[in-house]
């Protein structure tokens, strides 16, 4: 799937990334990347402040932030997300699983209910300094253990996440390069 590897090099697609171990039996794995002309220390705060009702998701705001515009600046009070903290996702919550500023931010689907045990979703943001600035590599790993879970992953989760994350990466690039 083209959206599953959007912008990523073959080496990035095959590389092990932080967070892979949090969903080792994933059926959906997608690696997407973008080069940002800014140092990682200037990109990471945009990622750290993400969340519904916070900075937003920098994607299609009318879908994932109920029309509220994603932040256009760094918000200091949203820079304190640490491992174990909740990241509001709207109807669902994520949890910060790995935070290693300014290089790694990994979130996973949070919660302890029956549904959260049957749906596993991990999203990693890995920032690597390059001569051009920062290479931002993302990896989604997911598994839906529900009836028709494989079909849900293939037909809805994979394409939907691909469209949204591609837009997010482009917006992150624009924001980080502008500030």
Regions found by a protein language model. Name each.
Residues 1-78, 177-178:
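Hydrophobic ligand-binding cavity/cleft-lining segments
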Residues 37-41, 97-103, 126-135, 173-179:
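A short, structured loop/turn motif at beta-sheet edges
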Residues 13, 112-174:
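Beta-strand/loop substructures that line and gate deep hydrophobic ligand-binding cavities in soluble
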Residues 29-31, 90-92, 118-124:
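Short, surface-exposed coil-to-beta transition loops
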Residues 81-84, 106-114:
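Short beta-strand segments that buttress and anchor functional surface loops
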Residues 23-25, 84-87, 115-117:
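Short Gly/Pro-enriched turn/cap motifs at secondary-structure boundaries
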Residues 40, 47-51, 67, 98-103, ...:
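Generic secondary-structure microfeatures
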Residues 66-92, 99:
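Secreted/surface-exposed cysteine- and glycine-rich disulfide frameworks
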């Amino acid at each position: 799937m083209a959206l599953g590897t959007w912008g990523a090099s073959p080496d990035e697609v095959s590389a092990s990334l932080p967070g892979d171990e949090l969903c080792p039996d994933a059926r959906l794995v997608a690696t997407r990347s973008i080069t940002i002309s800014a140092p990682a220390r200037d990109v990471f705060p945009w990622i750290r402040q993400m969340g519904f009702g916070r900075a937003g998701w920098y994607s299609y705001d009318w879908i994932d932030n109920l029309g509220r515009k994603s932040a256009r600046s760094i918000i200091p009070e949203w820079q304190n997300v640490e491992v174990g903290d909740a990241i509001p996702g709207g109807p669902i919550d994520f949890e910060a699983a790995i935070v290693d500023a300014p290089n790694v931010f990994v979130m996973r689907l949070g919660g302890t209910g029956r549904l959260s045990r049957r749906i596993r979703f991990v999203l990693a943001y890995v920032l690597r300094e390059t001569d051009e600035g920062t290479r931002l590599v993302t990896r989604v790993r997911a598994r839906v253990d529900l009836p028709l879970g494989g079909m849900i992953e293939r037909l809805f989760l994979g394409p939907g996440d691909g469209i949204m994350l591609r837009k997010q990466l482009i917006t992150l690039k624009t924001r980080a390069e502008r500030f």
